[in-house]
Amino acid sequence: MNYRGKMLSKEQAQVVMRDFMQYVDVCIANDEDFEATLGIHTFDGDLSTGIDQIDTYKEGMLEITRQFPNVKSVTSVLRNMHTVEEGDWMGIYYVDGKFYQSPIHRVHSLEAVGAGDAYGAAFVHGLINGFDPQKIVDFAISVSVLKLMIQHNFNVVTQEDVFKIMNSKNTNLSR
């Protein structure tokens, strides 16, 4: 969904997105998007406790599929931000009546710009390449946390780089 408050008010975004949702079958939304674009409350806005509020995210994902029956799956990144540079990140994916969760990664970020876009692109990559649901969410969050460790807007990593993160037992990541 990618809500941008400088472009539209929440009220304007909700009018536009609610109309647009009839054409959506896969919904990628971040923590702000649920409420800002659809009026669905998922968490209290405290980025230091996003992962801790996973049950409200799950309820929000279910609510999207109830309000918009054409939406077959919903995915999001959840974060517990300890500082601007330090945080825990995970992905969650709802499809076919089941929730899939990635491991939680502790990340020291160089720059957060583009991490959500990286997640979305990697998620679509997993869908296109026929990954199973767990692999999709694991792959997407791995690409996203790799982007956090790269400065500027270019996430130049290979699929092999991502698989190394996915297969690593170490979830404390830094570069």
Question: Where are the regions a protein language model picked out?
Answer:
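Conserved phosphate/ATP/ADP-binding segment of small-molecule kinases
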Residues: 2-97
